[in-house]
Amino acid sequence: MKKHNFNAGPSILPREVIEDTAKAILDFNGSGLSLMEISHRAKDFQPVVDEAEALFKELLNIPEGYSVLFLGGGASMEFCMVPFNFLEKKAAYLNTGVWAKKAMKEAKGFGEVVEVASSAEATYTYIPKDYTIPADADYFHITTNNTIYGTELKEDLNSPVPMVADMSSDIFSRPIDVSKYICIYGGAQKNLAPAGVTFVIVKNDAVGKVSRYIPSMLNYQTHIDNGSMFNTPPVVPIYAALLNLRWIKAQGGVKEMERRAIEKADMLYAEIDRNKLFVGTAAKEDRSRMNICFVMAPEYKDLEADFMKFATEKGMVGIKGHRSVGGFRASCYNALPKESVQALIDCMQEFEKLH
């Protein structure tokens, strides 16, 4: 039976990316060595990093004056590195969920943090719209997609101060005006690669402005100067990221990824809104294209476990909602085919007929 992978992360990757990574793990570039055992400074590996950086810049149309870094530590490390490198006195944060809240917590150790708005009172089911960003803030931090609650900023915001964005779960799903940001970061295990590598897009002239000492490993300048090679990088995930970037380009680039994301999300939301058994949880104008969250309608709440069992038997994987909110979550990242979305819709319709 075919499995349909809706996991929120680590998540689905294109089949050819998995297969080609597996080949390299056995024999990298005909070297007779596994990708897992070559030196990161081997002559065959530097071109991997160089091409991955070049494709990042090409696919996202990154302007001159920015560096692309491949680091460790996940987005959680960036919650600390961002204020370490950019927060001199004050930073503004938009609180749209758990990950934004965690980023705010780390920033408070480095200076004043202004929460410009929050949707916590509504369990983060919408993204705040009316707020004022302090003009004297060093930066304004946003989390563009909220995987737990299924909300998403689908366009770049306007800000009177430089922006920083956690784009862990929607990078490469839509075009971005990178010039609006001094830093974009994310864990790779949603739309880019297996877990283990963290991407950072950083504006070079924004680094080095704070007065504090920054340990070498936490200083963006260190990694800019060393081309992501200051310490041993996560070789296998970087190689898988390169293969995935090639795949995105071959499929038609970020605009095509956006078209597919809209199509898949529209299909599934239409079924949620039509089906008597299910209710969407996010405000309609803020619904995420990446993480589609829904619950049983109140009068059918007792069928939740039955539907989970039914869907699992039909090959649906990873649709259980986050433990903090419950219900269901279908993550529709770039590599998820439309056929999987249709299979979930068919499953929902079949279950509806039974009840």
Swiss-Prot record:
Cellular location(s): Cytoplasm
Q: Which domain of life is it from?
A: Bacteria
Q: What CDD domains does this protein's entry cite?
A: PSAT_like
Its annotated pathway reads:
Amino-acid biosynthesis; L-serine biosynthesis; L-serine from 3-phospho-D-glycerate: step 2/3; Cofactor biosynthesis; pyridoxine 5'-phosphate biosynthesis; pyridoxine 5'-phosphate from D-erythrose 4-phosphate: step 3/5
Q: What is its EC number?
A: 2.6.1.52
The record's keywords, sorted A to Z, are: Amino-acid biosynthesis, Aminotransferase, Cytoplasm, Pyridoxal phosphate, Pyridoxine biosynthesis, Serine biosynthesis, Transferase
**Know the name of this protein?**
Phosphoserine aminotransferase
Please name the source species.
Bacteroides thetaiotaomicron (strain ATCC 29148 / DSM 2079 / JCM 5827 / CCUG 10774 / NCTC 10582 / VPI-5482 / E50)
